């Protein structure tokens, strides 16, 4: 029989009875929102009456992310500098290198997201995959993965702001780029600090709509330009020659940029603890959108970019004075369409700022989960009445000051360092999601549990998890080879640590945790795994009955409905 999960302490967003009876104004409500949530126990013992409550929840984090917001986060949430800016440097390796690398990464990302859909719909917990690694792999490894993911997001915020300062140079101006960075910095921190989860969700929704409309519009325009609708006349496939400029090593190097551009896709799993509605239905539905984003907004778009911009174009990042330009903007500008490059550059800026906004959310929720697991300072556990992890947001704000490096002449070198560090850490995150899914499935079998009690089963099955894990490990190994023997150069210690610093940090945290806890077991035993705590449905029998009814209803549906439900 499954273990019965203990009930978490309940909280409400109310203030004290005296404060409520006075009907405080906007300023007092604002101040009170930073106070701790009030435990429901205070209601039961009479210190606060139930009529004074505006609403409550079972955990300090607010379940206020709507279905449409989750779907747009999955569909367009991670479209940022990796695709719109860093792809310029990747294109210098040739258009075929660009497309092959993105396709390879996309295949094992899809498998990874299916694993995450199964785990997050079953266990919609704060911290998501960091907690899954602790539960199903090893506490030390899970801790290392948590810090790895927290580091990824805390670095991404200044990275995106640096990218925005590079992009804004498109418009000639006497205004120092640091001024724009300051404006964007205040906007992002203010959104997370004063708007909370609702503001994050709505901001991501609007930004994703703008990004996706911009990319769809670019794709339509690109087809017209390729067919001869621009100043360059008929372009065809001439820019696809040569398809490779740096050989096999070029493809491998682009894998890092491709991973960085797709990193953050897993963020939708991190929202599981704050999703409104039934997590077992909402999350898988949102995660299924990833397939269409990969096909339409990445592979198709990058193919068209390869047709329009030659790999030898000096305007690409690292190629000269036009280092801040997006390859998308270059393509439109070379087409001779006045005004439109500026419009698309606005889309690029929106994308960069939206990712920076996600970075604050991602770091604050990950470090909160680590604190709840007892492996991060307890100050990070503080969540106020609006569901804001204040210490995590404050830490993001402090590290975000690195974005003012945009005033330095070395900003592009900093950009390259941050891209490399962030991109490599993603392989560890994705690989751990696959490993956690594999071990979870094995534990289910060892403990005699049925897969019928899972609210959602991964379309790719456990074989997809094995494929995802193997590919992540393989790419890490190839990146190690490239770090030791770089393209067109000799072995260099500085270059190696620039490319492989994330692996060093993961190993360091893993060893430190092992030594600190003196837990020398390599992995959690299958028979000892906790398969019940954190479940969205405590009564397994009722869940099985509901799932059986849903399966019977599904069988009666026409084939096109089944096709749609499987893929969408």
Swiss-Prot record:
UniProt keyword annotations, A-Z: Amino-acid transport, Cell membrane, Glycoprotein, Membrane, Transmembrane, Transmembrane helix, Transport
InterPro entries, sorted: AA-permease/SLC12A_dom, APC_YAT
GO CC aspect terms: membrane; plasma membrane
Keyword Transmembrane helix among record annotations: yes
One of the protein's GO biological processes: amino acid transmembrane transport
Major localisation: membrane
GO function term, MF aspect, one: amino acid transmembrane transporter activity
Protein name, per record: Amino-acid permease GAP6
Topology of this chain in the membrane: Multi-pass membrane protein
Reported induction: Expression is under control of the CSY1 amino-acid sensor. Expression is also regulated by PLC1 and GCN4. Expression is induced during development of rat catheter biofilm.
Comp. bias intervals (Polar residues): 9-19
Chaperone listed as a keyword: no
Annotated localization: Cell membrane
Glycosylation sites: 45
Membrane spanning residue stretches: 70-90, 96-116, 151-171, 175-195, 206-226, 250-270, 290-310, 343-363, 389-409, 418-438, 468-488, 493-513
Region: Disordered, residue numbers: 1-29
Similarity-based family: Belongs to the amino acid-polyamine-organocation (APC) superfamily. YAT (TC 2.A.3.10) family.
Biological role stated in the UniProt entry: Amino-acid permease with rather broad substrate specificity. Transports many amino acids including proline, methionine, leucine, valine, isoleucine, phenylalanine, tryptophan, threonine and tyrosine, but not basic ones (arginine) and citrulline. Functions as a sensor via detection of some amino acids including methionine, leading to a rapid activation of trehalase, a downstream target of PKA.
Classification of source organism: Eukaryota, Fungi, Dikarya, Ascomycota, Saccharomycotina
Annotated Pfam families: AA_permease
Taxonomic source organism: Candida albicans (strain SC5314 / ATCC MYA-2876) (Yeast)
């Amino acid at each position: 029989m499954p273990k019965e999960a203990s009930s978490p302490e309940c909280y409400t967003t109310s203030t004290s009875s005296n404060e409520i009876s006075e009907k405080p104004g906007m300023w007092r409500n604002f101040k009170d929102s930073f106070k701790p949530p009030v435990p429901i126990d205070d209601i039961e013992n009479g210190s606060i009456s139930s009529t004074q409550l505006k609403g409550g929840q079972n955990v300090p984090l607010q379940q206020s992310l709507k279905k449409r917001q989750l779907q747009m986060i999955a569909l367009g949430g991670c479209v940022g500098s990796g695709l719109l800016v860093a792809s310029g440097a990747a294109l210098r390796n040739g258009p075929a290198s660009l497309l092959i690398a993105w396709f390879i990464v996309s295949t094992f990302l899809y498998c990874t997201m299916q694993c995450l859909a199964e785990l997050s719909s079953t266990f919609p917990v704060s911290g998501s995959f960091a907690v899954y690694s602790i539960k199903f792999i090893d506490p030390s490894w899970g801790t290392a993965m948590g810090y790895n993911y927290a580091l990824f997001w805390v670095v991404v915020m200044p990275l995106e702001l640096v990218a925005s300062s590079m992009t804004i140079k498109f418009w000639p101006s006497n205004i120092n780029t640091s001024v724009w960075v300051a404006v964007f910095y205040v906007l992002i921190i203010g959104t997370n600090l004063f708007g909370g989860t609702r503001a994050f969700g709505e901001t991501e929704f609007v930004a994703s709509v703008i990004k996706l409309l911009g990319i769809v519009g670019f794709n339509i325009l690109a087809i017209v330009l390729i067919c001869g609708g621009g100043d360059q006349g008929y372009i065809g496939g001439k820019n696809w020659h040569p398809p490779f400029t740096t050989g096999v090593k070029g493809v491998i190097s682009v894998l890092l940029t491709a991973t960085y551009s797709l990193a953050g896709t897993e963020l939708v799993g991190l929202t599981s603890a704050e999703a409104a509605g039934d997590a077992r239905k909402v999350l898988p539905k949102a995660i299924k959108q990833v397939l269409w984003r990969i096909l339409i907004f990445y592979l198709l778009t990058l193919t068209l970019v390869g047709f329009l911009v030659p790999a030898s174009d000096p305007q690409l990042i690292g190629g000269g004075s036009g280092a801040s330009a997006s390859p998308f903007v270059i393509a439109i500008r070379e087409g001779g369409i006045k005004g439109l490059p500026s419009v698309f550059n606005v889309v690029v800026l929106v994308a960069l700022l939206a990712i920076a906004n996600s970075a604050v959310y991602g770091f604050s929720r990950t470090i909160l989960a680590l604190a709840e697991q007892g492996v991060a300072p307890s100050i990070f556990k503080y969540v106020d009445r609006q569901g804001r992890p204040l210490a995590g947001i404050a830490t993001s704000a402090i590290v975000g000051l690195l974005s003012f490096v945009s005033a330095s002449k070395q900003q592009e070198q900093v950009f390259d360092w941050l891209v490399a560090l962030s991109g490599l850490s993603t392989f560890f995150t994705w690989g751990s999601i696959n490993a956690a899914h594999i071990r979870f499935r094995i534990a289910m079998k060892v403990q005699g549990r049925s897969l019928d009690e899972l609210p959602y089963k991964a379309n790719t099955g456990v074989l997809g998890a094995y494929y995802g894990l193997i590919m992540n490990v393989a790419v890490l190994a190839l990146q190690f080879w490239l770090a030791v023997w770089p393209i067109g150069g000799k072995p260099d210690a500085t270059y190696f640590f620039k490319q492989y610093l994330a692996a060093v940090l993961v190993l360091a945290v893993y060893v430190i945790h092992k030594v600190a806890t003196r837990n020398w077991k390599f992995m959690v035993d299958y028979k000892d795994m906790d398969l019940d705590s954190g479940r969205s449905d405590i009564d397994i029998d009722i869940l099985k009955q509901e799932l059986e009814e849903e399966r019977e209803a599904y069988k009666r549906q026409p084939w096109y409905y089944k096709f749609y439900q499987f893929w969408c």
